[in-house]
């Protein structure tokens, strides 16, 4: 498992994309500066998680203390595996707080020790910049690898990009329960928390 984390974090396509304007990942890779934040494999204890959330790609904060190529391998693995534990609660992102609430609709009182998050595209960018150009390439390269580590029962596809790959996720994980929900950052008219919760519960059966 640690090998997969490092393979994704140090994805060999990044350097290829920097040198090739026609590479599917060129746009998203070149959106970062010289201090490249590593490709994000997943967050949490994926092999022990009971719920996995999949969204489009990780957002980027240039000021975050986040792994770069200068980090030791063991520190990179530890960062992603233990990210929820090492991040103070007052620094949790809106996304983290939201999925924790959603997870509680599936398994009451669940904590981040049993939740993992990953993305279709593993490179970071702001507002999904470059995602549509590289999503098929990235999913083909890494989605099966990531899902092979996950032993839990529930997969939540958050937002449009993740749901494009619904059939592929089902093919890889035919025995999982897959729940689809709009991304909270893209408001849907009339979709209250109560309606979203009921939609979650309806998809559990």
Label the predicted regions.
Residues 2-150:
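A polyanion-binding, active-site-adjacent surface
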Residues 1-9, 34, 121-205:
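Glycine/proline-rich loop-helix segments at beta-alpha junctions forming the active-site rim
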């Amino acid at each position: 498992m640690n090998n997969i984390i490092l393979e994704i974090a140090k994805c060999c396509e990044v350097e290829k994309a920097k040198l090739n304007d026609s590479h599917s990942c060129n746009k998203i890779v070149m959106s970062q500066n010289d201090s490249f934040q590593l490709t994000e494999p997943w967050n949490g204890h994926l092999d022990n998680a009971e719920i996995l959330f999949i969204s489009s790609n990780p957002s980027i904060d240039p000021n975050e203390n986040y792994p770069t190529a200068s980090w030791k391998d063991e520190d990179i693995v530890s960062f992603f595996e233990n990210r929820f534990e090492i991040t103070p609660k007052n620094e949790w992102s809106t996304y983290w707080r939201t999925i924790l609430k959603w997870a509680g609709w599936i398994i009451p009182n669940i904590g981040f020790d049993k939740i993992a998050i990953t993305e279709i595209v593993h490179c970071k960018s702001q507002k999904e910049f470059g995602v549509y150009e590289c999503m098929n390439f990235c999913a083909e390269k890494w989605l099966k690898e990531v899902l092979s580590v996950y032993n839990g029962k529930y997969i939540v596809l958050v937002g449009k990009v993740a749901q494009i790959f619904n059939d592929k996720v089902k093919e890889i994980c035919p025995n999982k329960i897959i729940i689809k929900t709009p991304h909270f950052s893209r408001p849907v008219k009339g979709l209250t928390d109560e309606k979203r919760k009921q939609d979650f519960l309806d998809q559990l059966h």
